[in-house]
């Protein structure tokens, strides 16, 4: 047997304190204390007794602050000194130990005073004594802790720094919880609480930074270096990082009751080898690679060990691991083979899942050099046996691979409780076994097979059990399903690794997701769920419990980078409602972001009692109300506080418990009412609560049909509007209002915003110099009520708003500023517009328009606001001035063009009438002349806004003046034409038909009568005035041979007719006063227009248009803005008749009160465009 010493036989911290070890019946009982022992005991205490009170204070005294003297504190310093090979100078060492002794003495006085006060809490003297003792303790710690961070000794002093920091945080938590009962005022308590939350982060980041510095310092290339590196990592995890990981639990307002935490990080005992003292050159990287990469936690079920032999020596050559996911919530899985599958002896299966798992290994090492010269100089460094001991309260037999040994894992990872046998007081259990192996070198053969034992803290339970009386923290790495994500190394202060959920890449099927199994012993307890996370951007996350979504909203960014995380880089979000275990036995987080990743640290389940819930709701309501105002005196609202948010805060206050906080509720109610009044005062919109539409459009809302006003529901507290879809884009559903010029300030940016419950194809416009446009699609959230014990209906049928939409991020930009069609992640929308100079005479104002022009479109929106955002400065000011100048230049050009067009149009209109009273048409005025004049009237640009044609434009007055006269002309013309449906626009209505005829619509959009057969006849009886004169005017076209005839006659004689033929020479008929000239001549005279009368222009609601969202583009273009719906206001661009149509007239004087108009032909086809019988003027 080789006498080379085993380096594991003398671990530095054991050598420092030289403890006595007694072996009683195979059990190890420590009678001495090392820094590792003390730290493990403290961690156990913090994990199990983290409740404010005398029990906690006295517990710290019993574990460390009441029993330590100079030698024990010196042991903490020596431990790290030896690990990093750096000795602290005598002055700094003595100063640190003296400070620690002073703190210990002072804390014992503090603890005794606390015990006496807790026994008689109303005693004024004891209350005053506690105030004195707290101030003394806090001052001493504030002064002492910087002395444990002496320059150049930050690493050697790190473990005592953390002990002092832990003490300071516990004292600050005491005053946060008990300060009011001690007699401190609220301001002092709040100030100390702020110190507490600030120092949690400061102490944490300091400890992790110098831990990493020390770890980097001890790294080296060889096996000896790695042993020291691993020892530093393992021991400072136990003495520093584990304690730091529990610092956040000192936040007494976030964790007001007992909190159950779990440490999922793994530590590693050294490779179980003899002669592992540095002869293995350059092996440190290989050893480190043999450790598992970050992973979801699993449960070690069994180890199947294979045996090989070399020259008669049997050894552990390889193994396979069988494991289960946490909670045994899935099938068992097998890891790839570690090492080699030797067959020198039968494989042996070690069952790890007995009792509480394997807590201890006793290994036998083997080192041999069979030959010592030449190429046969061989080294065999292996393990030839191990005993696996189970954690249990009974004497459960150990499992043994080949034989037990003397290399004890408890020498490196001691128990956390030395007052009981190690099988009960153990601190860690075996979680995995990997292997370091090495092959051949240049001059010798080296066989190295070193199993690497990984250990996890016993607080990381097999199942995720949710306590009914404590806040339960479940690390995300205890999940059993991870999709599009990864497990990453923890930063050192989280107690384990983290889960990163990747972005979906805008593919909803690829959203990162982590799922965690949970178990509830109590089925009646209600819980809220809180998640600790880190993100560099505002990110939309969804939390599901079972099949129900309990949280879905955008949470704010917490970090500037996800690399080198600091404690301040993590934030929390929480479900607003409480739920029972009936929702299911899984909880998960899904990343809805298409572009950003998120890191999930842990889930927290907070049990809700009536008192706790009332306190939570009151605190939440107070924070929400105070956050509305710019200052504590409530003089003004924050700009980013929306009207919708105020309503939701009001809901929070409304549903506070009258039983627990009636006075506070009344006070908060007055504050939120004041906030609502301030919101109304700054809102420039009239009737923002939608009391009525179209009552006074000039002073409120105007709108179309298809709009309904609905009362509040579980989303909206006040009235909101619903806009439905439309079957014709020329008749959209719309809602509009004008912001009067008198309400606007010069050179100021204004913002339109509101809340959209859901929408499809909702177009939003702000119009001043141009149209700022946004198309918004907001998917509906469905019911706001996931499966829960609460009902969405109140006892009187009113909506229950106990779960308002308060997950609100004021920093989130909810708008698509470039005018593109987009789906908002948020239901909040905003659109801004800049105002340049103001002119009350011009009264340009700002038009606000909501419009839907598709069949599938719809929208539900409310809490609309138009408010001042900020004065314009710098580039924004220059931009609006430039935009206004361009607008005015084009406006001047438009005025010049309008004067010319108006003059021409007016002349055309005036020519239709006899006089300026416009009450009588000229005798020769025909329908073509009226349409030609109408076309010229419609050539006036900017009569109405293209975005919504019910809104008048700059030329509305002159357009309506002339258009009114056109309507008068049509009316007068109708009055003197006694034939009904003479243009066949209504088919054959009013006409009698014999035989087969058709009414066809030509390509020029004209309806014509087609008589294809000689035996067909179309007629109409017309009443006339005997003795008066009439003009029969017909426009028609003859195809083929024969003649087309339009006859007028009475019962007896008095017959006349107009004949049409496909002839070249002009025909003269008796009494015919007009020759058969080509009709296009008349068209040219009147501009080629022949437009029909249609709906009145007031019925035309809209125009599709494409508008950029910057001022310089498309404000007033030089050409006419295209408007395919313009004919719906009374104008349709009739093209001239094709060549061949002629118009003929004859005079007729009836002798009776009835005449007949008959249309027929002799052969071929006769096409009639119009028939008119006009009463002559007297």
UniProtKB/Swiss-Prot annotation:
The keyword RNA-binding does not apply. It comes from the Bacteria. Toxic segment of the protein is located in the N-terminus. InterPro entries: Cry1Ac-like_dom-VII, Cry_V, Galactose-bd-like_sf, Pest_crys, Pest_crys_dom-III, Pest_crys_dom_I, Pest_crys_N_sf, Pest_cryst_cen_dom_sf. One of its GO terms (molecular function) is toxin activity. The keyword Transferase does not apply. Belongs to the delta endotoxin family. Promotes colloidosmotic lysis by binding to the midgut epithelial cells of many lepidopteran larvae. Introduced by genetic manipulation and expressed in insect-resistant cotton and tomato by Calgene (Monsanto) and in maize by Dekalb Genetics. Keywords: Genetically modified food, Plasmid, Sporulation, Toxin, Virulence. PANTHER family: ENDOTOXIN_N DOMAIN-CONTAINING PROTEIN-RELATED, PESTICIDAL CRYSTAL PROTEIN N-TERMINAL DOMAIN-CONTAINING PROTEIN. GO terms for biological process: sporulation resulting in formation of a cellular spore; symbiont-mediated killing of host cell. This is Pesticidal crystal protein Cry1Ac.
């Amino acid at each position: 047997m080789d006498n080379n010493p085993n380096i594991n036989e003398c671990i530095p911290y054991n050598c420092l304190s030289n403890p006595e070890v007694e072996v009683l019946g195979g059990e190890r009982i420590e009678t001495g204390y090392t820094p590792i022992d003390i730290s493990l005991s403290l961690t156990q205490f913090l994990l199990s007794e983290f409740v404010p009170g005398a029990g906690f204070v006295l517990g710290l005294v019993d574990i460390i602050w009441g029993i330590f003297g100079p030698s024990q504190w010196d042991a903490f310093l020596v431990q790290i000194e030896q690990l990093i090979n750096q000795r602290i100078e005598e002055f700094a060492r003595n100063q640190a130990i003296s400070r620690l002794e002073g703190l210990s003495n002072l804390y014992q006085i503090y603890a005794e005073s606390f015990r006496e006060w807790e026994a008689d809490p109303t005693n004024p003297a004891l209350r005053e004594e506690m105030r004195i003792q707290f101030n003394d303790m806090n001052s001493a710690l504030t002064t002492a802790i910087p002395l444990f961070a002496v320059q150049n000794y930050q690493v050697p002093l790190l473990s005592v720094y953390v002990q002092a920091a832990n003490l300071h945080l516990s004292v600050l938590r005491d005053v946060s919880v008990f300060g009011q009962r001690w007699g401190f005022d609220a301001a002092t308590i709040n100030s100390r609480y702020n110190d507490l939350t600030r120092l949690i982060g400061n102490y944490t980041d300091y400890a992790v930074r110098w831990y990493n510095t020390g770890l980097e310092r001890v790294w080296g290339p060889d096996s000896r270096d790695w042993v020291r590196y691993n020892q530093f990592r393992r021991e400072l995890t136990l003495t520093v990082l584990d304690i730091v990981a529990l610092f956040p639990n000192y936040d007494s307002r976030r964790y007001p009751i007992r909190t159950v935490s779990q440490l999922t990080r793994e530590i590693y005992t050294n490779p179980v080898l003899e002669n592992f003292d540095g002869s293995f050159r350059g092996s440190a990287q290989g050893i480190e690679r043999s450790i598992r990469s970050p992973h979801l936690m699993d449960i070690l079920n069994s180890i199947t060990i294979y045996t090989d032999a070399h020259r008669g020596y049997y050894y552990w050559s390889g193994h396979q691991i069988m494991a289960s996911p946490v909670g045994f919530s899935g099938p068992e899985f097998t890891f790839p083979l570690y090492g080699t599958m030797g067959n020198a002896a039968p494989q042996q299966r070690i069952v790890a899942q007995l009792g509480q798992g394997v807590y201890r290994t006793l290994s036998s090492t083997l080192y041999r050099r069979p030959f010592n010269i030449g190429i046969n100089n061989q080294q065999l460094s292996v393990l030839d046996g191990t005993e696996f001991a189970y954690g249990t309260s009974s004497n459960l037999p150990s499992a043994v691979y080949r034989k037990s040994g003397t290399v004890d894992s408890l020498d490196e990872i001691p128990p956390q409780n030395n007052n009981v046998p190690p099988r009960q007081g153990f601190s860690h259990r075996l979680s995995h076994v990997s292997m370091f192996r090495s092959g051949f070198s240049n001059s010798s053969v080296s066989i190295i097979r070193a199993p690497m034992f990984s250990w996890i803290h016993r607080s990381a339970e097999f199942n995720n059990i949710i306590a009914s009386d404590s806040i339960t923290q479940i690390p995300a790495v205890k999940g059993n399903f991870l999709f599009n994500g990864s497990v990453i190394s923890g930063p050192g202060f989280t107690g384990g690794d983290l889960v990163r959920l990747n972005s979906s890449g805008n593919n909803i099927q690829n959203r990162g997701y982590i799922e965690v199994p949970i178990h509830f012993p109590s089925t009646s307890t209600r819980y809220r769920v809180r998640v600790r996370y880190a993100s560099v951007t505002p990110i939309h996350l969804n939390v599901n419990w079972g099949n129900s979504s309990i949280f879905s909203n955008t949470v704010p960014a917490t970090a500037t980078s996800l690399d080198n995380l600091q404690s301040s880089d993590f934030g929390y979000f929480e479900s607003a409602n409480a739920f029972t275990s009936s929702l299911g036995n899984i909880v998960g987080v899904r990343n809805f972001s298409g572009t950003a990743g998120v890191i999930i640290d842990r889930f927290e389940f907070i049990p809700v009692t009536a008192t706790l819930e009332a306190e939570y709701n009151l605190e939440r309501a107070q924070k929400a109300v105070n956050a509305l105002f710019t200052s504590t005196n409530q003089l003004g609202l924050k700009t980013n506080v929306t009207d919708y948010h105020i309503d939701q805060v009001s809901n929070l206050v409304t549903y506070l418990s009258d039983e627990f906080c009636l006075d506070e509720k009344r006070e908060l109610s007055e504050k939120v009412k004041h906030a609502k009044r301030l919101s109304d005062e700054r809102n420039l919109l009239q009737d923002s609560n939608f009391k009525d539409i179209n009552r006074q459009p000039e002073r409120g809302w105007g709108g179309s049909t298809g709009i309904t006003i609905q009362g509040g529901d579980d989303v909206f507290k006040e009235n909101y509007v619903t806009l439905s879809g439309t079957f014709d884009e020329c008749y959209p559903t719309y809602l509009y209002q004008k912001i009067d010029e008198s309400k606007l300030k010069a050179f100021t940016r204004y913002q339109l915003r509101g809340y959209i419950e859901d929408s499809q194809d909702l177009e939003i416009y702000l119009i001043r110099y141009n149209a700022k446009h946004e198309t918004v699609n907001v998917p509906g959230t469905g019911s706001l009520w996931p499966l829960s014990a609460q009902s969405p209906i109140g006892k009187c049928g009113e909506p229950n708003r106990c779960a308002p939409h308060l997950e609100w991020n004021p920093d989130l930009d909810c708008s698509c500023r470039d005018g593109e069609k987009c789906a908002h992640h948020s239901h909040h929308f905003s659109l801004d517009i800049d105002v340049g100079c103001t002119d009350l005479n011009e009264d340009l104002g700002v038009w606000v328009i909501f419009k839907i022009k598709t069949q599938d479109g719809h929208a539900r929106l409310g809490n609309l606001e138009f408010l001042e955002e900020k004065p314009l400065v710098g580039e924004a000011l220059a931009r609006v001035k430039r935009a206004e100048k361009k607008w005015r230049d084009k406006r001047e050009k438009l005025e010049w063009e309008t004067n010319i067009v108006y003059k021409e149009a007016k002349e055309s209109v005036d020519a239709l009438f006899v006089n300026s009273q416009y009450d009588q048409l000229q005798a020769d005025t025909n329908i073509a002349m009226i349409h030609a004049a109408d076309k010229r009237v419609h050539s006036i640009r900017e009569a109405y806004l293209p975005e919504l044609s019910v809104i008048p434009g700059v030329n509305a007055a002159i357009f309506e003046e002339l258009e009114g006269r056109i309507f008068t002309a049509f009316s007068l013309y109708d009055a003197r034409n006694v034939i009904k449906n003479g243009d066949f626009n209504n088919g054959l209505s009013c006409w009698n038909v014999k035989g087969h005829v058709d009414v066809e619509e030509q390509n020029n959009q004209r309806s014509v009568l087609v008589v294809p057969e000689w035996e067909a006849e179309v007629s109409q009886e017309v009443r006339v005035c005997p003795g008066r004169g009439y003009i029969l005017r017909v426009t028609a076209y003859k195809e083929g041979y024969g003649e087309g005839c339009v006859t007028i006659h009475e019962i007896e004689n008095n017959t006349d007719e107009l004949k049409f033929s496909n002839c070249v020479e002009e025909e003269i008929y008796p009494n015919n006063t007009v020759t058969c000239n080509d009709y296009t001549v008349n068209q040219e005279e009147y501009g080629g227009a022949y437009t029909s009368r249609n709906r009145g222009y007031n019925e035309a609601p809209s125009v599709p248009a494409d508008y950029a969202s910057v001022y310089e583009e498309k404000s007033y273009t030089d050409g006419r803005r295209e408007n395919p719906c313009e004919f719906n206001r009374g104008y349709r661009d009739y093209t001239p008749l094709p060549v061949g149509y002629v118009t003929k007239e004859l005079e007729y004087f009836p002798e009776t009160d009835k005449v007949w108009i008959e249309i027929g032909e002799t052969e071929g086809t006769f096409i009639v465009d119009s028939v008119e019988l006009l009463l002559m003027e007297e």
